[in-house]
Amino acid sequence: MKFLFDLFPIILFFVAFKVWGIFTATAVAIVATLAQVAWVAFRHRKVDTMLWVSLGVIVVFGGATLVLHDEKFIQWKPTVLYWLFAIGLLAARYAFGKNLIEKMMGKQLTLPVPVWDKLNVAWALFFAVLGVANLYVVHNFTESQWVNFKLFGTTGAMVVFIILQSLWLTKYLKDE
């Protein structure tokens, strides 16, 4: 259910784009992300840092898209967000000694520290590659193809990555 909740702004962006175009879709994404943060704050009294970062990036890049009437800003937003996630994962681990992947998943999985470190680097690399892939699609395909990639391509890549990661992790999990 959380996965669908996380996709809420992207799905609304996709639908709004198909019906009204990029600029209305951008406004819808900003409002949807604001609503998402408000709901999480109301429901849980705490909003994850990643969601705050997502909100900041969509407001800045979406706002620039609307004010300057230039769709490139909203198209760059996923790359900036993915690269911030990648940098955040690596900086937290190597500058501050905190493995954010372990912090998020440590209650569900018991893994040795070197495995957590590999997982952290794998996620950072995954986000870095997604950022590059987004730029490639932005500059080599139509706006409509980019919107399809944004919803289906990146979501599909995420699902495949999680499945592969799960298969890799099975060798480290003990029978409980």
Curated annotation (Swiss-Prot):
Transmembrane segments: 3-23, 24-44, 49-69, 72-92, 121-141, 149-169
InterPro entries: YciB
Record keyword DNA-binding present: no
Location of this chain's protein in the cell: Cell inner membrane
Topological category with respect to the lipid bilayer: Multi-pass membrane protein
Cellular component, GO, one term: plasma membrane
Entries under Pfam families matching the protein: IspA
PANTHER family on file: INNER MEMBRANE-SPANNING PROTEIN YCIB, INTRACELLULAR SEPTATION PROTEIN A-RELATED
Name of the protein: Inner membrane-spanning protein YciB
Organism: Burkholderia cenocepacia (strain HI2424)
Gene label: yciB
